[in-house]
A protein has these predicted regions:
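Active-site neighborhoods of divalent-metal-dependent phosphate/nucleic-acid chemistry enzymes
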Residues: 65-106
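Histidine- and aromatic-rich ligand-binding microenvironments
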Residues: 2-5, 31-33, 87-89, 107-110
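Short secondary-structure capping/turn micro-motifs that flank functional sites
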Residues: 59-60, 73, 113-115
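Short, well-structured N-terminal submotif of metal-dependent ribonuclease cores
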Residues: 1-31, 43-55
Protein backbone atom coordinates (compact mmCIF):
# COMPACT_ATOMS: atom_id res chain seq x y z
CA UNK A 1 0.00 0.00 0.00
CA UNK A 2 1.17 3.53 -0.83
CA UNK A 3 -0.21 6.79 0.54
CA UNK A 4 -0.82 9.35 -2.20
CA UNK A 5 -0.04 13.00 -1.68
CA UNK A 6 -2.31 15.43 -3.53
CA UNK A 7 0.59 16.27 -5.86
CA UNK A 8 0.90 12.63 -6.93
CA UNK A 9 -2.82 12.25 -7.62
CA UNK A 10 -2.84 15.55 -9.54
CA UNK A 11 0.17 14.40 -11.59
CA UNK A 12 -1.77 11.25 -12.46
CA UNK A 13 -5.01 13.08 -13.27
CA UNK A 14 -3.36 15.78 -15.39
CA UNK A 15 -0.77 13.47 -16.99
CA UNK A 16 2.10 15.44 -15.48
CA UNK A 17 5.62 14.20 -14.75
CA UNK A 18 5.45 10.91 -12.83
CA UNK A 19 1.92 10.03 -13.89
CA UNK A 20 2.95 6.68 -15.38
CA UNK A 21 4.38 5.50 -12.07
CA UNK A 22 1.27 6.58 -10.18
CA UNK A 23 -0.84 4.78 -12.78
CA UNK A 24 1.15 1.58 -12.21
CA UNK A 25 0.40 1.55 -8.46
CA UNK A 26 -2.93 3.40 -8.24
CA UNK A 27 -4.88 0.25 -7.34
CA UNK A 28 -2.62 -0.19 -4.29
CA UNK A 29 -3.00 3.36 -2.93
CA UNK A 30 -4.93 5.28 -0.36
CA UNK A 31 -5.22 9.03 0.12
CA UNK A 32 -6.18 11.08 3.14
CA UNK A 33 -9.30 13.21 3.13
CA UNK A 34 -7.20 16.37 3.62
CA UNK A 35 -5.31 15.60 0.41
CA UNK A 36 -8.55 14.83 -1.40
CA UNK A 37 -9.70 18.31 -0.41
CA UNK A 38 -6.53 19.76 -1.94
CA UNK A 39 -7.20 17.90 -5.20
CA UNK A 40 -10.84 19.02 -5.24
CA UNK A 41 -9.71 22.59 -4.59
CA UNK A 42 -7.70 22.46 -7.80
CA UNK A 43 -10.78 21.33 -9.72
CA UNK A 44 -12.89 24.05 -8.08
CA UNK A 45 -10.26 26.70 -8.83
CA UNK A 46 -10.32 25.64 -12.48
CA UNK A 47 -14.12 26.01 -12.66
CA UNK A 48 -15.10 22.36 -12.27
CA UNK A 49 -17.62 20.90 -9.85
CA UNK A 50 -15.66 19.52 -6.88
CA UNK A 51 -18.49 17.14 -5.96
CA UNK A 52 -18.40 15.51 -9.39
CA UNK A 53 -14.63 15.13 -9.08
CA UNK A 54 -15.04 13.60 -5.62
CA UNK A 55 -17.51 11.03 -6.95
CA UNK A 56 -14.90 9.93 -9.50
CA UNK A 57 -12.23 9.59 -6.81
CA UNK A 58 -14.69 7.69 -4.61
CA UNK A 59 -15.46 5.30 -7.50
CA UNK A 60 -11.76 4.63 -8.11
CA UNK A 61 -9.76 1.86 -6.39
CA UNK A 62 -8.10 4.50 -4.18
CA UNK A 63 -9.22 4.29 -0.55
CA UNK A 64 -10.10 7.69 0.95
CA UNK A 65 -9.01 7.72 4.60
CA UNK A 66 -10.58 10.19 7.07
CA UNK A 67 -8.24 12.53 8.97
CA UNK A 68 -8.29 11.45 12.62
CA UNK A 69 -7.07 12.77 15.94
CA UNK A 70 -4.08 10.44 15.69
CA UNK A 71 -3.20 11.98 12.33
CA UNK A 72 -3.58 15.48 13.79
CA UNK A 73 -1.06 14.70 16.54
CA UNK A 74 1.39 13.11 14.11
CA UNK A 75 1.07 16.02 11.66
CA UNK A 76 1.63 18.55 14.44
CA UNK A 77 4.75 16.70 15.60
CA UNK A 78 6.16 17.05 12.07
CA UNK A 79 6.02 20.87 12.07
CA UNK A 80 9.58 21.43 13.39
CA UNK A 81 11.09 19.11 10.77
CA UNK A 82 8.98 20.29 7.82
CA UNK A 83 8.62 24.05 8.28
CA UNK A 84 12.03 24.92 6.85
CA UNK A 85 11.22 22.86 3.74
CA UNK A 86 8.00 24.78 3.14
CA UNK A 87 5.74 21.77 3.60
CA UNK A 88 2.05 22.53 4.10
CA UNK A 89 -0.54 21.14 6.46
CA UNK A 90 -1.70 18.92 3.60
CA UNK A 91 1.82 17.57 3.19
CA UNK A 92 2.05 16.83 6.90
CA UNK A 93 -1.39 15.18 6.82
CA UNK A 94 -0.17 12.84 4.08
CA UNK A 95 3.02 12.06 5.99
CA UNK A 96 1.02 11.43 9.17
CA UNK A 97 -1.22 8.92 7.36
CA UNK A 98 1.84 7.25 5.88
CA UNK A 99 3.51 7.00 9.29
CA UNK A 100 0.34 5.69 10.96
CA UNK A 101 -0.01 2.95 8.34
CA UNK A 102 3.73 2.34 8.02
CA UNK A 103 3.43 2.72 4.24
CA UNK A 104 5.47 4.64 1.68
CA UNK A 105 4.34 8.17 0.83
CA UNK A 106 4.07 8.89 -2.89
CA UNK A 107 4.59 12.55 -3.80
CA UNK A 108 5.67 14.77 -6.66
CA UNK A 109 7.32 17.15 -4.17
CA UNK A 110 11.08 16.61 -4.25
CA UNK A 111 11.60 18.51 -0.97
CA UNK A 112 10.25 15.49 0.90
CA UNK A 113 13.41 13.53 0.08
CA UNK A 114 15.27 15.69 2.62
CA UNK A 115 13.10 14.39 5.47
CA UNK A 116 14.40 11.88 7.98
CA UNK A 117 11.28 9.84 8.73
CA UNK A 118 10.53 6.19 9.53
CA UNK A 119 8.79 5.77 6.16
CA UNK A 120 9.86 5.57 2.54
CA UNK A 121 9.29 8.63 0.36
CA UNK A 122 8.67 7.80 -3.29
Amino acid sequence: MNVLDASALLAFLFRERGHRYVESVISECCIGSVNVSEVLGRFSRDGHDPHAAYLKIEASPVEVVPFTGEHAVLAAALVPQTNSLGLSMGDRACLALSISRNCPALTADRAWSALNLPIEII
